[in-house]
Amino acid sequence: MTTNSTASTQRSSTPFIILFVLGAIVLVGLLLLVSLRLAIWIGTLLLLTFIVLLAGRVFTGNWLGILIDERKKMSLSRFQTVLWSVLILSAFLAAAIANLLVANNATGALSISIPPELLGILGISVTSLAGAPLVLNSKKGPIDRNKGKEPSDMPRWSDMVKGDDVANANYLDLSKVQMFYFTIILVLAYGAALVAMFMLADHRHSTIGEFPALNATTVGLFGISNAGYLVYKAVPRVLPPDMSQAPAGQTTPADQTPAASSVSPDPQAPQTPA
């Protein structure tokens, strides 16, 4: 049954991958008419994204395998780290390639300053990636160890916004929801800033010397979001008592069934002659 579920997941993901590749080809072709540097970055971004997806497919059998943790669940911390890593690495590589076309030397092409605020965001993401498994392992019980091994517990996108414990696995985790929105909004906002950087730079004369800076307040909010995510994950939770079980000392109807008793014949009862 597990094999069938995995095969079904792979079949459902394949059409999206094909559409992604076709859309990427069309998009890069259109961007070549707008800005060469922007086209280089978008092409690099799509290439790195495809490599990440392909690695997941090769090593786990699932195109989204890089987002799946050891519990067979979609991990929000993995999702966040992958988004920031692909975004920043693709922009750095594209900027280096664009600079190389102008500077004609490797030293000048790699002279790109990355703002400390951006490094702080990457550090916060990696901290959440490393801290989430530590928190979960510290509170793991016998029931939690078996979670994710059943065919019905295949990875789903909803895993990134649902609780990690057995007690809240079917409920939305507010700490995950807020962190998901923070991540998406910041990635889109910084992606727009990178688009402006690549479009406004003069590809014939100037090189790209630094990435767009981030506000310290934004980094602080991002850090608070991730801290809340880890702290809420560390809170112990227990299942409510099973109401189907009878309280201690109370007998069930089966226990109240009278046992078969032997009734001695009444000595005054009339005897049937043989």
Which functions belong to the PLM regions below?
Residues 12-67, 76, 117, 197, ...:
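An N-terminus-focused feature that recognizes amino-terminal "leader" regions
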Residues 87-101, 144-148, 245:
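Compositionally biased, low-complexity linear motifs
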Residues 21-24, 48-58, 81-95, 112-140, ...:
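Short hydrophobic alpha-helical transmembrane segments
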